[in-house]
Amino acid sequence: MPPERRYQIALCVLYTCFTLLRFRYRRAARAQIPVPREDNGDAQRLGVLIPYEVMTFFLYLLLPRTLAWAAVPVPAAVRWAGAALGCAALVLFAWVHRALGANYSWLLQLREGHTLVTSGPYRWVRHPMYTAFILLHMAAALLSANAFLGLTWLGGLALLLAGRVRREEAMLTEAFGTKYKAYMARTGRFLPGVGRAVNLAKARTHGSKKPSQG
């Protein structure tokens, strides 16, 4: 079997497992009380990003020569590290869904009786599901060793999350007030410990700007 075929199979297995996992929890979410669809542009952006990723994914699998011009030399160990990263992303997805329970929604909406989840991975990170998406996209970039696929997938995800995260945090701040602000102060947005480090840096900056007494 050609070495490239092994990477293609690994990527295919990862995204098949991801699709099955998401389908399971989305189906459960649809069975709950329906909510109005969001109207903030995310649906339109997803309507472009998802078909694009599916198209380039199958181009890489079935017609790899069409993307060969963007192939980059990546050591085998690094590419297989991408597979391990993808497995970690799948585990994180499952953990996130288990922590969210009935609070999960693929829409940027709060359901009736929505609670602030601070258990599981949410104990350290405010948006662990987005972290899992980032890890999965990084895994695809490493496994495919294709600059075009990796950069456009990660770039598209970054554009989507840039606005969505701000809106989500504003929505949760409005809903939970000081409780969510305190939660933000002790957690990172995508990585654990970053929030606290940022707050300490801000405190030191403000402290250094205080006028000296003489």
Residue spans of the language-model regions?
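Membrane-anchoring alpha-helices and their flanking helix-loop junctions
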Residues: 1-118, 136-214
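Histidine-centered phosphotransfer motif of kinases
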Residues: 119, 123-131
